Amino acid sequence: MALDRRGFLKFIGGATAGILATPVVWKGLDDVSIWSQNWSWIPRNIKGANSYVPTVSKLCPTGIGVRVRLVDGRPVRVIGNPEHPLSKGGVSSIAAAEVQMLYSPARMKRPLKRSPDGAYVMISWEEAEAMLLDGLKAAKGGDALACISGDDNGTINELLSAFVQQSGSKSFFLMPGEAQPAAKAWDLMGGEGQIGYDIEKSDFVLAIGANVLEAWGTAIRNRHAFGASHPHGAEPTAQFVYAGPVLNNTATGADDWLPIRPGTESAFALGLAHLLIKAGASSSAPDFDAFRSLAASFSPEKVAAQTGVDAKALTALAQALAKAKHPLVIVGSEFSQGAGAAPVMAGIALNMLLGSVNRDGGLRALPVARKVVPAGMDRKAMLQQDLTLWASAIASGKAKAPKAMLVYEANPVYALPQGSAFKDTLAKVPFKVAFTSFLDETAMQCDLVIPVSMGLERLDDVCTPYGCGEVVYSLATPVTAPLFDTKPAGDALIALGGKLGLDLGVASFEDMLKAKAAAHGADFDKLAEGTAFTSRATVGANLSFRPDVLSKALDVKAPALPLALAPVMKLNMGTSKTAIPPFNTKTIRRWEVQGKEGYVMLNGATARKLGLAQHDRVVLSNPTGKVTVRVNIFEGVMNDTVAMPLGFGHTAFDEFSKGKGENVMHLLAPSTEPVTGLAVWTGAGVNIAKA
């Protein structure tokens, strides 16, 4: 059934509302001072002049602009930048903690190498660079060198990919996210450039799966758009509807929440397409008739059976979409990764039927600036690479392992589905190097660890994060000199490339960013002053529905297990490359983790059916793995579904993350989406039993 905000609050009552609103710190720690947030390494009582420096957060995946408060030249606080288009004065919980993380004792302070006994020892930069040079000399030709980047949208990816390609390899990969399946869907349907979602100008936003107000795309900008359309004491100027398995932050904020089973986003979207076409929606696309035939098989009754949505609610939603002047449909993963191209294709098809392509308030085709590193990959080529399938092939022996691997600000051992299996991949690589600011799970498996200056200590950039409704290019400028013996990776790699005889085509990292600014038509000096470049330009969008691809890509079989698994991502709990910032421990809710034990969420009906009660210790298991957790009864979860938060279960990093809860990625295994060949892992199921 559909559940609006007022109805839900009446249903759950004040007690549950209090739980949702009250953050409680973890219990059971031996040293209570750890949780006081009065740590000795945090700057305080600094006397001196105040100043505010604009820059961009490289830690937060939303690409927001921030202002850093300095006292006597020392960074002490991050606040939102009201002048930045992706911030509008807002700031994410992870960006807000970025200054604190500068001073963390867990930061990498010197290069490390693994000794013969497996322990790490500190070495000089000279020794580290010599070791790196020797290791990479042996990795030339074929696919002998691989690189994984955790930077979603920086120009450094062109440099890293150039480094790989000049060595004779094609094995450059980005960490999985929403952009890769969207790029595949967009390409299959004939799109040019990058998909953009013009949320600010829409009067009806339907998010299917995509957690747009918390962890999907440009979440802080999305929140501002939502707030602007819902002024206090006045009628909303836009309606937000969320369809997904969990009452997450997007569902809580939205005007309506329609619970649907995990992994059924495509069927839900095609059910809406069927109703829109039945009501008269059409398209000039050459394959519209074939798409109409495909959509006709998704009647409200069939979609209700597949997704769990109420058929009448689906019909009412289709009618509301059709009446809107500027409707927008966004389809994505509930936890910002693991979805295939099929759900995105179904979402694009809905926007086509609604006449919302390349118009204000709709789906927009954004131009992508040309690459500026001649030997590097362009953005489209990067997004075609599938890290998960590549790593699985090596781990299983179906593909040859590279001789050397560079991992840049990424943590695949922790963050990939069945990520612990990535250890098997790394074990087959003779020489492994991590460029990182923290000793995370992946760095712990590497032979050499290079300490990278954090985003507030270096020059960097952000190119139109996925989800933007317009082109946005921003420059991250250093607000302080490196606090420890660290270096930005860009110039170090350029110098290393010269010693290896690689023709990277760039003289310095700053010159590379100046070229990227010029490629956007932006003024570098204004960017350096903190002014983001924006453009409302679009490129052509001569789209087709591609029902031939979509019909086959839908054929992903969910495992026949009692419960569907719904991972939940929240930025306060970190990202795929960052663990829980110490400041954010106070935002962890009581029944998300207690001491070292994590919690999962079931609704009351599902718990009663399984004979479970609040706080019961249970084992979730499937052929991929198993975890031991406790039960939290929460009515904001779909029937026969168990919701589990991301961000817990670290085995490395620092005392604030290590050993807290379980890693949901242990329960997720990739399968292959038919036709597209993409790795997908949004349709997992689990068994549940009392521990």
UniProtKB/Swiss-Prot annotation:
Major location, coarse class? periplasm
> Which branch of life, at top level?
Bacteria
Alphabetical list of Pfam families matching this protein: Molybdopterin, Molydop_binding
Task: Name all 4Fe-4S Mo/W bis-MGD-type domain ranges.
Answer: 50-106
State the family it belongs to: Belongs to the prokaryotic molybdopterin-containing oxidoreductase family.
* Biological role: Component of the respiratory Qrc complex, that catalyzes the reduction of the menaquinone pool using electrons transferred from the reduced periplasmic cytochrome c3, and which is probably involved in sulfate respiration. Is likely essential for growth on H(2) or formate since the periplasmic hydrogenases and/or formate dehydrogenases act as primary electron donors for the Qrc complex. The function of the QrcB subunit is unknown; in the absence of a catalytic site, it may provide a structural scaffold for the other subunits.
Subunit = The Qrc complex is composed of four subunits: QrcA, QrcB, QrcC and QrcD. Can form a supercomplex with the [NiFe] hydrogenase HynA1 and the tetraheme Type I cytochrome c3 TpIc(3), its physiological electron donors.
- Specify the signal sequence span: 1-27
Gene Ontology annotations for the cellular component aspect, listed alphabetically? periplasmic space
**Compartments it resides in:** Periplasm
For this UniProt record, the keywords arranged alphabetically read as follows: 4Fe-4S, Electron transport, Iron, Iron-sulfur, Metal-binding, Molybdenum, Oxidoreductase, Periplasm, Signal, Sulfate respiration, Transport
The molecular function terms of the Gene Ontology recorded here are: 4 iron, 4 sulfur cluster binding; metal ion binding; molybdopterin cofactor binding; oxidoreductase activity
> Posttranslational modification, per the record?
Predicted to be exported by the Tat system. The position of the signal peptide cleavage has not been experimentally proven.
Q: How is the cofactor bound?
A: There is no molybdenum or tungsten pterin cofactor present in the Qrc complex, despite the similarity of QrcB to molybdopterin-containing oxidoreductases.
What's the protein here called? Menaquinone reductase, molybdopterin-binding-like subunit
